[in-house]
């Protein structure tokens, strides 16, 4: 199970090789300062399965029709992403479809904070309900069902956790980026760079006997 990566077809998730190396590199550079378990040349089994579950959940989301939602990661404040209580209740973003699985803003002093986003968020459940909810009282009338769906969306439109935005091609919205976290991008980036500086200074001690190092 450690030696495959994922691609998606219509209703299928395909297995290929080498996913462990990818997950290890991503998790190491984002969480090694706060999680001693990943300071090795290979992920421990429990950390690997956590990371794999995040990747599989996202791919299964795509088979259900969920699109990548790059607005989700700015719904929560950068400060809240350092809170053990907040992250245990809400995860790192309201959608697993945003693309950033790991809490790179968490600092070594942030004890108990959630480090991985591997469960469905509030936006995901909302999008699945929109796509699959059945209205038996509307007797299959598409116009009446469409009206109900519009009402469903309008109830959530003012709440930022239900915001959706696709990958940008030509426009530039700083709140819609891939692999970002938090509502304050400058602060999140500063915290992430602090972690990278620590990792760089400790790399020789944390990773030993690695043929690629």
Task: Give the label of every model feature segment.
Residues 26-35:
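Preference for solvent-exposed, low-hydrophobicity sequence contexts
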Residues 54-69:
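Active-site recognition of the HExxH zinc-binding catalytic motif
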Residues 1-14:
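Single conserved hydrophobic/aromatic residue that forms the stacking wall/gate
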Residues 38-56:
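Short pre-active-site segment immediately N-terminal to the catalytic Zn-binding motif
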């Amino acid at each position: 199970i450690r030696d495959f990566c994922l691609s998606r077809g219509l209703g299928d998730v395909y297995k290929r090789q080498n996913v462990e190396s990818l997950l290890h590199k991503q998790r190491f550079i984002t969480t090694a300062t706060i999680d001693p378990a990943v300071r090795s040349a290979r992920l421990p089994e429990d950390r690997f399965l956590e990371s794999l579950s995040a990747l599989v959940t996202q791919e299964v989301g795509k088979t259900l029709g969920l699109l990548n939602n790059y607005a989700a990661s700015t719904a929560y404040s950068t400060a809240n992403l350092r809170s053990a209580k907040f992250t245990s209740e809400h995860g790192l973003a309201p959608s697993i479809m945003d693309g950033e699985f790991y809490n790179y803003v968490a600092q070594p002093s942030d004890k108990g904070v959630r480090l991985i986003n591997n469960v469905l968020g509030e936006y995901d459940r909302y999008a699945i309900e929109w796509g699959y909810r059945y209205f038996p009282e509307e007797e299959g009338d598409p116009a009446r069902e469409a009206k109900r769906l519009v009402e469903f969306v309008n109830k959530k439109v003012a709440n930022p956790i239900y915001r959706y935005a696709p990958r940008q091609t030509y426009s530039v919205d700083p709140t819609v980026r891939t692999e970002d976290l938090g509502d304050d991008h400058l602060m999140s980036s500063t915290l992430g760079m602090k972690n990278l500086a620590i990792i760089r200074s400790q790399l020789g001690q944390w990773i030993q006997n690695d043929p690629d190092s």
